[in-house]
Amino acid sequence: LETDGLDFCMERLEHRNPSYGVDFADMHLIDIRAELKNFTIDGPVIHTDIGRLAMRERSGFVVEDLAGCLCIANGCIDIREGHIRTAKSNIELPSLSLIGLDWALYKNFVEEVDITAQVVNTTLSSDDIAYFSPKMKDWHLTLTDVNADVSGPVADMSGSLRSVRTGADTKLSVDFAAQGLPDVGKGHFKADISELTTSAADVDRLA
């Protein structure tokens, strides 16, 4: 199955109308270009192997390339052997699951959608995450060499960052639990740090 220039709209009667980011109650996917294999629909379950998928959402979020084995069902999204590339991020996902009891809970993605992910050799920009978690809009933080396992919703997440780099000199390896994200100022954090190196210039930039 191939598509080129397809538009898709998913609209509910009650819009969330966020000032920034994706409105899951009024989502418009534009110029979808895809190569799909083994595409099946079984009731509420959609399964396919994605060879290539590119699209943009009306919020401004753009996926330049997405590939992997995808399953969607009743508020759950599961990706295996996934790869996602945007202008600022390059994400390798051996596994990713987004689990909501139904699609309506995605309106409150930060608190209501459970995430389980394994990430390897990844570059990740907070500018991309901000489309789904608008409080991160002004962070402008890029993480590189990300190797991690995480679980939980954004607001109550735990995991193991085996490695992550940011700035010119900062490197971190840590097991963590974080509550209250993305509001860092009001959040609560527990960390078992295996390695931390940084510089005064990086600290000033992150402060």
Q: What residue spans do the PLM features occupy?
A:
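N-terminal targeting/secretion presequences
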Residues: 1-207
